[in-house]
Amino acid sequence: MQIEITRRSLLAGVIYGALANFIGSSSKSYAAQELNIILGRPTSNSIALNLITSNSMSCYIEYGTTGRTFPQKSAILQLSAATPTVFELKSLKPNQKYFYRVRFKASGAATYSISKSYNFQTARTPGKSFAFSLHGDTHPERAGKMFNSELYYVAMANVAAQGNDFHILMGDDFSIDPLIAKGQANKENVEKIYRTHRDWLGTIGATTPVFLVNGNHEQAAQYLLDGSLTNPAVLAGNARNKFYPQPAPDAFYTGDNLDVPGIGKLRDYYSWHWGDALFITLDPYWHSKYAVDNVAGVSVEDNANNKKNGGGASKVSDLWQVGIGDEQYAWFKKTLETTKAKYIFVFTHHVMGTGRGAIEVSENYEWGGKDPKGVTTFAAQRPNWELPIHDLMVKHKVSILFQGHDHIFVTQQRDGLIYQSMPNPADDTFSMFNESAYKSGVKAPNSGHVRVQVGADEAKVEYFLAARAKDTSRKNMQVAHSYSVKPRMV
């Protein structure tokens, strides 16, 4: 793999105002009814539109390819106030930009009112250039420590202005740990966590489909399952799928076929092709019988002592006991073996799902095959696996492994594989958390998002900073670091 890395510092852009999605008002409509849209699971011929309205009403979606006429219509659905409803837009064309509007009316209204026009992109065909974006851990529950709401709106407005085909969140965006610690992890409170995040993601969600990667603080994890339908893992899994349309295996996506009682399909790991690239997400949390990272509702000190709280099993020190599991590994291996894509991008919350650093810990356990003493015990510990995860990715020339968890931007490389650690989008302390865990690489402080432009000759990665007017030490949309990755040889 050929990699070109260059530093850039472009002072450009201004702070974009937070973009709220509101229905336009008219003499025949209500005054500015709020409309919150999250697009998801786009394919070459369909897309899901998850809609929340502030009042109960009947709605349908009209759409077309010109922005002037909207000849295609969805089914008319009855929406209850503040309740997410999914519209499936079908019979679409691949590699096509679509424009759409929401038509809505309350009970007793004579005619349907019309929202403003939005747009989305169906799956690109091979040879077509495109861009996608992503950001690391949001942690809205850590306001004042590594999260600021105003700054998050700025970061999302920056993403919206770029018009990327889709956006990926890297996990720890819907933490329910505080609820579990207080004994308040019920359905209403867990769903509120997922609903509230749409206030920020609504800035991009009407035009940019959102993909989610599972993180440790979501506590959507196997170790918490206890047979009840009210345990935190089931509540988190259901809330995720209720408010964010994520992929399940079909003709376009491959992924987790497991059905969990009370949830159904987890939609936690999946893959898809888009243009010249293959995208793969991984998840160790739903496939480990023990806590991979922090135990739900337990402090850092108690975690160190392996104490249990909030249900489920305690955290283990032997990380051979946790991981992605045989089924997910076999799927991952097959997905890598069968692709002809020029680029492969893999997304996971963190190497092994826990710890700090990237290449520094990539030689350990199922990721690299060694135990803490540096002895290779892979064959005994994973007898059904061909290679450790890192070696499997190197064999198949994965372009970039993206991870979150560490709250810092770092670009590293091992064996020709780039490890890209992702920054927080809205940390107003602009810190480089866990910097000491990274012994090498290009480092940059929070906050902002990463954009990847994928073309026939290279994929260009850029880290865009987010800044408010009062953040005079930085410029909004300044490029803190950029590099290019060449296509893999297949």
Located regions from the model:
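Residue-level marker of structural boundaries
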Residues: 19-20, 469
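Generic low-complexity, intrinsically disordered sequence content enriched
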Residues: 14-15, 23, 93-96
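N-terminal secretory signal peptides and thylakoid transit peptides that target proteins
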Residues: 1-18
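Metal-dependent phosphoester/phosphodiester hydrolase catalytic core
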Residues: 30-433, 442-443, 451-490
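C-terminal segment of classical bacterial N-terminal signal peptides
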Residues: 20-28
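General helical secondary-structure elements
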Residues: 3-4, 24, 37, 236
